[in-house]
């Protein structure tokens, strides 16, 4: 097996038993693929597929004018180049987007000609606004912030059948309903009422009998009955009737007379109920007709009109109940044939017939008018208006679209075989839905489960952006139609017709403020990936928190392998926001698919198929862990399987599919929890969620006990630097890596140089620090997709969210009561949990009414000491250590002229000055913040002079760019001359460059020439001369290209910045704040075991083992049993073994043992105790030594979820590490030196520091701002508010009878304005008295009572 550059430096011992059939797919594919599909960038006119932008344009164009004399057609579109790259957009606070240019064709028809001859055609490109681009990591930069568009899980379009679960009617009767949901357009509902009539609703308005809709479609009563019922035919023979017999229809009826066969034998006696046995006998006897008395048809319903044979007079309309009067008329008129509807109470109810009876309309027009009245109450209906409205509802492609998915789901549900068809409904569709609904009511067929993932689909970014874009285009369409009529008379061009503002506004609104456009969670790489793999049921067209019930939030059997059953937020959104499972993907219809291995007759193949929830229902699917022999055959007699969404057991021969991996059930975050199978689900949920809140520590530390997914997450998240192409590291420093690309990967005519600029100390969305550190050194060979630099929270290309801590589970002096955590001071000294937070502070200079604000170091009434960190431009220098209240940017604002006192006038006359007409509005460091300035950015509006600081920043940026380009040129030049050298050495020169004719060229000769002189050489072979010329041209060409690139960047830097109206200058100051761990910070493990640091103890007081090694953390053992997250105990044991093995390897290295011994010991670890075998023999001795050095701090282990280390393997590892197999050891109290009375579980657990830091929450106030109306102090840290002394606290003081304290709280400390000013003055004077007055809220109360018209006054004595 081949190891990558970083993998072979530190191999993880993997305990998995099952082979990798399939790698975990690229984790951001769902975002990138969807948006790539939407843009179709780089496609030519013929290559456009009917999706995304192209589809949106095609659905709106051509736009035809109202008169029909002009049309605007769509030809194609192209995307321009982005103005700035991603980093520049983030810095400048602009959107990373490309201009969209659409080619349209304006066609003007000749009015005079009859056949619409074309008079004029104009074609033009029109600018249609900017389209945001997705970065390579699946995010968008909108106004300088990284955002993610979360995918939405919504109800698929199609038709759904349901019932009310007996809740509507008091009898508990099930009322069935059907609903046709289009992708866009009106909803159509059919429903039964308690009397079993069918009603229809359009867009949830008032209901009408369903027959009204059928009549509006043009069906007559007879056609409707014909469609829904079969008929019984009776031939009238005198007093009796002969029934054309269909024996099946008699089942369950009571025989009205003896039924005899041809031979006169009685088959059914009169008065007996007819059973299936009787029907068999009747079918055998072959009776075709049955004679029944006339009153047999009483109460039956006619299926056809009964007409008097002689006069043509109508005796009974169709759908009329036959009574004795009608029967009398029939007998009189000698009618020969009567057709009645066949209905019964079991499986063929008279529902449609009953509905027709309550329907007041009798023809199509009346039905259309009735629908018009329901849709537009109060408007007078006309025939045309009614017809237009009805046609637009379901039959017009502009207003109604089922979409391809909707049509597919619709056809499948009503039992058709073809899955394609029109996007609008037709008559047959509506009748088919009604038939299916009636069948379900009759007991044939079942209702749908709307939480089944076959009925819910995922809308990804691309699709939602397309919908928004279409909305914008439809707005444009209206305006264009108006203007088209003027187009021919005024000779307008397409550009004059189209106003792109509505489109741009719709797109901007979607990306900027849609509910699904979320601020990217950038705490750590895992939170980024999770954010992009989210699936939300909320958002436009989705559910709302308040209305979502339990069923929607619950785990459904179809979630298996598609949506993670564990990872979802706690709180009101539980179950509505989910995460995609590790292997899930969407199919072309947007349904989630999961991969399976194909199983044929008990033999498991390596063929993999992706199936959606609907497709997998009929399969019998075995678990990934099902037992197999070497021939890949299932060997158990019965295998645990899933079939029809149920868990059962089946014989191996019945199995058709098998899971690809045990971790296919869970999401990325859950698959990072080792021993997940031993944790309670609720705690696993907390563990998954808390990993996303871990703050990247100063020095990342890989988990000793991981799951093997860490490398995938780090690689796919995009925080690491991954080699685009293989090659040799040419140079490397802290901020860039330069790779000379391997010859076989260089494309012709390009430099063969890859320069990777590393991100240094940049602020993330969550104010954490993003910093990349190189892993490679000069001369190293790297392959494509090797990891060359670590990002935040990654260690050698593996995700590293926390630190491995030595922990003990023991109750200790109550310091770890109720989940508190007791830490050792060593953790602080070693900076294990020190994190860097970067804060961005902004100072804006605006143009005010009284004049412009100015950024300057000349600030009135501020001492020298306060200005000592500012430069002459008034901006703090980089590297300054600043604390709360320090000035970062000096700024003065003009203030209005005030009336001067005579003294001031005199002073002014003497000192002559205008300093007092400005006030100090400088940017200061906020309270509670202390840090180092690491960067300053200055943005200046066009036309405003740039200060010295802005110019120096620009110069340093230009130098950086120049250095990059020079480096690139140096390598290009070097590589070119190397190729020339290999071509020239050993060849003969003709002269030139001071050489004689016939002289052989050697390395020494070439070294003696300057590079420029090489091109003057004349060689004997023409091919070589040509090569020299080409090389010279290539180098000149590259130089010119790089100079152009530099000029382009320079132009961008020097042009003014696009600032908001009224803003002259913006200065951004970045502060790096170092936060050590301290009491009050929240910490957690990966198993939902969270707690708050309660105390930090000196190292010498901590419990220690017999060797004197103290523990770092003491955790409470009582936190484990009730919470049932035993995974943390197993992790602790395995962590102890991992650390012990590392120490053994360290001792071997210190004793300088032979490599062969090292190999033997490593082989014991990796290949002799269960799990995956590692090919250590492929590594050279140096690589083995490198590996051993990296294993000194512990051998990292991987225990994949549901396929991890067994207890026996953990014990074997402990034994190999010379540790007690129980995982427990005798500890001693550091303060007394006494032994604790029983052995304690000690080991290594991976602990995270969460982004809930006490520094961000701690807050105190003495005086500050007050609310405007009530004059009470504001609340909350952000407003610098006070602590609320609430109702219950008042009761407490009342209960103690502390009257003066209570009075103080309710008056001078709250909203007694005069009292609190006096109090302040008294304290300043050293006189500690208070004079309480009237609280302001009392005055508010009086005002409110007066506003009710009650005159109220306070009587003061």
From Swiss-Prot:
Listed under catalytic activity are: RNA(n) + a ribonucleoside 5'-triphosphate = RNA(n+1) + diphosphate
An MF annotation (GO) of this entry = DNA-directed RNA polymerase activity
Enzyme class, first EC level, given as a word: transferase
Q: Tell me if Mitochondrion is a UniProt keyword of this record.
A: no
Highest taxon above the source species: Bacteria
Q: Give the EC number(s) listed in the UniProt record.
A: 2.7.7.6
Q: Tell me which Gene Ontology terms the entry assigns under biological process.
A: DNA-templated transcription
Its cellular-component GO annotations read: DNA-directed RNA polymerase complex
Gene3D superfamilies, per the entry: 2.40.50.100, 2.40.50.150, 3.90.1100.10, DNA-directed RNA polymerase, beta subunit, external 1 domain, DNA-directed RNA polymerase, subunit 2, domain 6, RNA polymerase alpha subunit dimerisation domain, RNA polymerase Rpb2, domain 2
Q: What are the entry keywords?
A: DNA-directed RNA polymerase, Nucleotidyltransferase, Transcription, Transferase
Query: Transcription: is it a keyword of this entry?
Result: yes
- Name of one Pfam family that matches: RNA_pol_Rpb2_3
Q: Which InterPro entries match?
A: DNA-dir_RNA_pol_bsu_ext_1_sf, DNA-dir_RNA_pol_bsu_external_1, DNA-dir_RNA_pol_su2, DNA-dir_RNAP_su2_dom, DNA-dir_RNAP_su2_hyb_sf, RNA_pol_bsu_bac, RNA_pol_bsu_CS, RNA_pol_bsu_protrusion
Q: How does it assemble?
A: The RNAP catalytic core consists of 2 alpha, 1 beta, 1 beta' and 1 omega subunit. When a sigma factor is associated with the core the holoenzyme is formed, which can initiate transcription.
Write out the similarity annotation. Answer: Belongs to the RNA polymerase beta chain family.
Its biological purpose:
DNA-dependent RNA polymerase catalyzes the transcription of DNA into RNA using the four ribonucleoside triphosphates as substrates.
* Listed name of the protein: DNA-directed RNA polymerase subunit beta
Query: What species does this protein belong to?
Result: Pseudomonas syringae pv. tomato (strain ATCC BAA-871 / DC3000)
């Amino acid at each position: 097996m081949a190891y990558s550059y970083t993998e072979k430096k530190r191999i993880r011992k993997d305990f998995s038993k099952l082979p990798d059939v399939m790698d975990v797919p690229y984790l951001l594919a769902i975002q990138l693929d969807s948006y790539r599909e939407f843009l179709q960038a780089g496609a030519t006119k013929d290559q456009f597929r009917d999706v995304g932008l192209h589809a949106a344009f095609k659905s709106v164009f051509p736009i035809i004018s109202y008169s029909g004399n002009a049309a605007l057609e769509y030809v194609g579109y192209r995307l321009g180049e982005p103005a700035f790259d991603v980093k520049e957009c983030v810095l400048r606070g602009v959107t990373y987007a490309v201009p969209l240019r659409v080619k349209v064709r304006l066609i003007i028809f000749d009015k005079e000609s009859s056949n619409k001859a074309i008079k004029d055609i104009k074609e033009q490109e029109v600018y249609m606004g900017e389209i945001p681009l997705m970065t390579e990591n699946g995010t968008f930069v909108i106004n300088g912030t990284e955002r993610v568009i979360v995918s939405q899980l919504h109800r698929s379009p199609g038709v759904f059948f349901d019932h009310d679960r007996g809740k509507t009617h008091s009898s508990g009767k099930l009322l069935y309903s059907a609903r046709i949901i289009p992708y866009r357009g009106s909803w159509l509902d059919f429903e039964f009422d308690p009397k079993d009539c069918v009603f229809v609703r359009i867009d949830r308005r008032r209901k009408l009998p369903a027959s009204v809709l059928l009549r509006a479609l043009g069906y007559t009563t007879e056609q409707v009955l014909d469609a829904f019922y079969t008929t019984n035919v009776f031939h009238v023979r005198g007093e009796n009737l002969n029934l054309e017999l269909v024996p099946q229809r008699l089942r369950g009826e009571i025989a009205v007379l003896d039924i005899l066969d041809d031979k006169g034998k009685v088959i059914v006696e009169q008065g007996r109920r007819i059973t299936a046995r009787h029907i068999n006998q009747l079918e055998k006897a072959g009776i075709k007709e049955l004679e029944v008395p006339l009153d047999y048809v009483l109460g039956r319903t006619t299926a056809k009109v009964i007409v008097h044979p002689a006069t043509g007079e109508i005796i009974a309309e169709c759908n009329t109940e036959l009574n004795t009067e009608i029967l009398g008329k029939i007998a009189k008129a000698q009618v020969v044939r009567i057709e009645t509807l066949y209905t019964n109470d079991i499986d063929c109810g008279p529902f449609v017939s009953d509905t027709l009876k309550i329907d007041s309309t009798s023809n199509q027009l009346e039905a259309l008018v009735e629908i018009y009245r329901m849709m537009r109450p109060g408007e007078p209906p006309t025939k045309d208006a009614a017809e237009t409205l009805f046609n637009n509802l379901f039959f017009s492609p502009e207003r109604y679209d089922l979409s391809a998915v909707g049509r597919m789901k619709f056809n499948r549900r009503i039992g058709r075989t073809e899955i394609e068809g029109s996007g609008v409904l037709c008559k047959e569709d509506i009748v088919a839905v009604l038939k299916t609904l009636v069948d379900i009511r009759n007991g044939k067929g079942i209702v749908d489960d709307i939480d089944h993932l076959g009925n819910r689909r995922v809308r990804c970014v691309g699709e939602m952006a397309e919908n928004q874009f279409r909305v914008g285009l439809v707005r444009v369409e209206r305006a264009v139609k108006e203007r088209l009529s003027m187009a021919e008379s005024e000779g307008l061009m397409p550009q004059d017709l189209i106003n792109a503002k509505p489109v741009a506004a719709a797109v901007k609104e979607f990306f900027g403020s849609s509910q699904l456009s979320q601020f990217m969670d950038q705490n750590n790489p895992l939170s980024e990936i999770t954010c992009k793999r989210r699936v939300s049921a909320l958002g436009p067209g989705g559910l709302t928190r308040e209305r979502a019930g339990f069923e929607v939030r619950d785990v459904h059997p179809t979630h298996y392998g598609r949506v993670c059953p564990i990872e979802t937020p706690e709180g009101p959104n539980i179950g509505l926001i989910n995460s995609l499972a590790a292997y899930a993907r969407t199919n072309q219809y947007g349904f989630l698919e999961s991969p399976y291995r194909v199983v044929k007759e008990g033999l498991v193949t390596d063929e993999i198929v992706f199936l959606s929830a609907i497709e997998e229902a009929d399969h019998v699917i075995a678990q990934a862990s099902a037992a197999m022999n070497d021939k890949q055959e299932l060997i158990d007699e019965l295998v645990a399987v899933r079939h029809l969404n149920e868990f059962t057991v089946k014989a191996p021969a019945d199995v058709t599919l098998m899971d690809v991996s045990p971790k296919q059930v869970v999401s990325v975050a859950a698959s990072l929890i080792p021993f997940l199978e031993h944790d309670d689900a609720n705690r696993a949920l907390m563990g998954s969620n808390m990993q996303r809140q871990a703050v990247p520590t100063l020095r990342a530390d890989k988990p000793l006990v991981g799951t093997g997914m860490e490398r995938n997450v780090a690689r796919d998240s995009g925080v690491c630097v991954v080699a685009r192409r293989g090659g040799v590291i040419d140079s490397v420093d802290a901020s860039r890596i330069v790779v000379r690309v391997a010859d076989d990967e260089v494309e012709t005519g390009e430099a063969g140089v890859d320069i990777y600029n590393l991100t240094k100390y940049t602020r993330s969305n969550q104010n954490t620090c993003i910093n990349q550190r190189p892993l490679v050194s000069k001369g190293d060979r790297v392959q494509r997709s090797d990891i060359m630099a670590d990002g935040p929270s990654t260690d050698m290309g593996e995700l590293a969210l926390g630190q491995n801590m030595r922990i003990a589970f023991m109750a200790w002096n109550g310091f770890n009561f109720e989940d508190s955590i007791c830490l050792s001071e060593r953790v602080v000294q070693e900076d294990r949990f020190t994190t860097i937070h970067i804060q961005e502070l902004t100072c804006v200079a605006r143009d005010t009414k009284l004049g412009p604000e100015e950024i300057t170091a000349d600030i009135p009434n501020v001492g020298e000491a306060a200005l000592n960190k500012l430069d002459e431009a008034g901006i703090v220098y980089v590297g300054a250590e600043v604390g709360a209240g320090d000035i970062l940017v000096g700024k003065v604002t003009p203030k209005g002229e005030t009336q001067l006192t005579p003294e001031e006038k005199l002073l002014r006359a003497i000192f002559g000055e205008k300093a007092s007409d400005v006030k100090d509005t400088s940017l200061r460091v906020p309270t509670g913040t202390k840090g180092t300035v690491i960067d300053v950015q200055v943005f200046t509006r066009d036309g405003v002079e740039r200060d010295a600081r802005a110019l120096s920043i620009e110069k340093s940026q230009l130098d950086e760019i120049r250095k990059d380009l020079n480096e690139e040129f140096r390598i290009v030049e070097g590589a070119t001359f190397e190729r020339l050298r290999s071509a020239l050495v050993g060849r003969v020169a003709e002269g030139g460059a001071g050489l004689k004719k016939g002289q052989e060229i050697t390395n020494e000769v070439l070294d003696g020439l300057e590079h420029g002189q090489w091109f003057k050489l004349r060689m004997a072979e023409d091919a070589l001369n040509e090569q020299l010329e080409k090389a010279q041209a290539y180098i000149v060409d590259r130089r010119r290209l790089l100079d152009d690139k530099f000029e382009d960047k320079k132009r961008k830097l020097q042009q003014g910045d696009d600032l908001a109206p009224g803003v002259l200058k913006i200065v951004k100051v970045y502060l790096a704040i170092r936060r050590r761990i301290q009491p009050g910070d929240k910490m957690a493990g990966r198993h939902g075991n969270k707690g708050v640091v309660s105390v930090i103890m000196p190292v010498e007081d901590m419990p220690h083992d017999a060797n004197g090694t103290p523990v770092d953390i003491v955790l409470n053992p009582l936190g484990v049993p009730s919470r049932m997250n035993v995974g943390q105990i197993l992790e602790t044991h395995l962590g102890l073994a991992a650390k012990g093995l590392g120490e053994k390897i360290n001792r071997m290295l210190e004793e300088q043992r032979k490599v062969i011994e090292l190999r033997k010991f490593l082989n014991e670890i990796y290949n002799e105790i269960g799990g995956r075998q590692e090919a250590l023999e492929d590594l050279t001795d140096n690589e083995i030594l490198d590996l051993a050095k990296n294993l000194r701090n512990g051998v990292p282990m991987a225990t994949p979820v549901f396929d991890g280390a067994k207890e026996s393997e953990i014990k074997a590892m402990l034994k190999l590490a010379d540790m007690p197999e129980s995982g427990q050891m005798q500890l001693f109290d550091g303060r007394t030196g006494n032994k604790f009375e029983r052995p304690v579980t000690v080991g290594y657990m991976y602990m995270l520091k969460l982004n809930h830091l006490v520094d961000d929450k701690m807050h105190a106030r003495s005086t500050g701002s007050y609310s405007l109306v009530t004059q009470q102090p504001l609340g909350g840290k952000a407003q610098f508010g006070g602590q609320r002394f609430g109702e219950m606290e008042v009761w407490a003081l009342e209960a103690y009878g502390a009257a003066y304290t209570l009075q103080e709280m309710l008056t001078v400390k709250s909203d007694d304005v005069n009292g609190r000013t006096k109090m302040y003055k008294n304290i300043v004077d050293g006189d500690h008295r208070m004079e309480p007055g009237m609280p302001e809220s009392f005055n508010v109360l009086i005002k409110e009572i007066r506003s009710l018209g009650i005159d109220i006054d306070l009587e003061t004595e």
